[in-house]
Amino acid sequence: MSTEKINLDIHKILTLLPHRYPILLVDRVLELEPHKGIKALKNVSINEPFFQGHFPKRPVMPGVLILEALAQAAALLTFAEEQPKDPENTLYYFVGIDGARFKRVVEPGDQLILNVTFERYIRGIWKFKAVAEVDGKVAAEAELMCTVKTADAAP
């Protein structure tokens, strides 16, 4: 990603995503190039509610939430392409996850860097290559497939 770099703060993210606490998992967009990719971050705090039970003696961010954070970054990339007509009534759904791999634990105090690259758009399905890193090391990776629906048209 290079040429035109767009970054978004939490205030702009809140206008684009319907997610709210405790499931909003993107704190800032560091770089976004429409139709190419996005680099975002999630600051992982000990105050996250999931750490109470996963795991109390050795808190680890659940892998499915890392994938969710990557999907939220993908949604921001999608909405940069195609601004929803009614953002408050627009939902972004997973339709598939392929090749998910978890390579390292994510712990309180880590800064999760979310890198998502656009691959293709076919028949209403967006496909992305997604990699989450901590300190330059891959924590998780997957291919994500998502679709956009209005809340009243959702399954």
Curated annotation (Swiss-Prot):
The active site is at H54. It is found in: Cytoplasm. Its main location: cytoplasm. One of its GO terms (cellular component) is membrane. Keywords: Cytoplasm, Lipid A biosynthesis, Lipid biosynthesis, Lipid metabolism, Lyase. Coiled coil: none annotated. InterPro entries: FabA_FabZ (IPR013114), FabZ (IPR010084), HotDog_dom_sf (IPR029069). GO terms for molecular function: (3R)-hydroxyacyl-[acyl-carrier-protein] dehydratase activity. Signal peptide: none annotated. The keyword Ligase does not apply. GO terms for biological process: fatty acid biosynthetic process; lipid A biosynthetic process. Its EC number is 4.2.1.59. It catalyses: a (3R)-hydroxyacyl-[ACP] = a (2E)-enoyl-[ACP] + H2O. Belongs to the thioester dehydratase family. FabZ subfamily. Involved in unsaturated fatty acids biosynthesis. Catalyzes the dehydration of short chain beta-hydroxyacyl-ACPs and long chain saturated and unsaturated beta-hydroxyacyl-ACPs. NCBIfam families: fabZ, PRK00006.1. This is 3-hydroxyacyl-[acyl-carrier-protein] dehydratase FabZ. The gene is fabZ.
